[in-house]
């Protein structure tokens, strides 16, 4: 028995040697009986929109699939786009939440952005959308 995706040609990012940021997310059909998908990275970086200083953080993405699942390489390269962009922690959580919701149309999606301390304050922003 195999888990091979029959239409793998549709996953162009996964099959490529792309090593630069991308703005699109790729998907594949959700397998039966998967109730929650969770991604975590401790490598989220962006730029403070006021000072231009780098911001570092941890990002957790959770969603309940409807018909589609998110392909992880395209997610990694999508998150890379924020390295050179200025965003507040809250705006970044909101933007990522909306992008995933618009792409997957899941039953719900929650994005938790935990920004590392700056000025002695750690910021956590949680974005949430449900159908």
Spans of model-derived segments:
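N-terminal intrinsically disordered, cationic/polar leader segments
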Residues: 1-131
């Amino acid at each position: 028995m195999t888990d091979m995706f029959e239409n793998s040609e549709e996953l162009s990012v996964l099959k490529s040697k792309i090593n630069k940021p991308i703005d699109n997310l790729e998907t594949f059909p959700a397998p039966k009986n998967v109730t929650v998908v969770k991604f975590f990275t401790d490598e989220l970086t962006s730029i403070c929109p006021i000072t231009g200083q780098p911001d570092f953080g941890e990002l957790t993405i959770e969603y309940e699939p409807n018909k589609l699942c998110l392909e992880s390489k395209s997610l990694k390269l999508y998150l890379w786009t924020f390295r050179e962009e200025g965003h507040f922690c809250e705006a970044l959580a909101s933007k990522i939440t909306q992008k995933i919701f618009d792409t997957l149309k899941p039953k719900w999606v929650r994005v938790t952005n935990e920004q590392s301390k700056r000025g002695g304050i750690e910021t956590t922003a949680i974005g949430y959308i449900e159908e």
